[in-house]
Amino acid sequence: MLERLVHGAAALGVALTEHDAARLRQLLGELAHWNRQFNLTGITDLESMVSHHVLDSLAVHRYLHGAAIADVGTGAGFPGLPLALVNPEHRFTLIDSNGKKIRFVSHAVRTLGLMNVDPLQARVEALRPERPFDTVLARAFAPLPELLATVAPLCGGQTRVLAMKGKWPQAELDALPRVWRVADSHTLTVPGLAEDRCLIVLMSGVAH
């Protein structure tokens, strides 16, 4: 598994040390253990977790912007935990309303010694941070119009919302409010995952 993690991450532009890879393997071990009792994820075997959780998360590593990152609807901590592990210079706030999932995230943060992660049990739409986040991550959170309405209070003029999607969401893009624009988009190829993946980068403001 360590070799799969290192080689898969390298294909995504992430240079994992052996220590990083061992910590990611430890994360998946903890997830598998907790999952037997708390049903945190539908992916139950470790080998599938490598692609569906860790490498899928690391696929957006190169698109992070700024130091303050929010992961909304983080679930069991993806994509936030793997990204925080390989980006210790960034500060990650992992947000979910589900108590058992945030308890797992908090456990993983302690177990892995992640000093740059703040787990937060809350409804995203109720948050009013003192400062906007630089990047807001969302993996399978909601259709784009609903996502943007929910995360708007977390965003400033330079915030980038990274929406991780499966198939290209043309109908959702057609329904975007005019106060948002697509700043960029990318097709993602995740090693070991034979499924469509794309990333939509959104910013507030109308393009000129």
Which residues does each PLM region occupy?
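Conserved SAM/SAH cofactor-binding pocket of Class I
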Residues: 55-138, 148-149
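A short glycine-rich, Lys/Arg-flanked "PGG" loop and its adjoining helix->strand segment in the class I
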Residues: 148-160
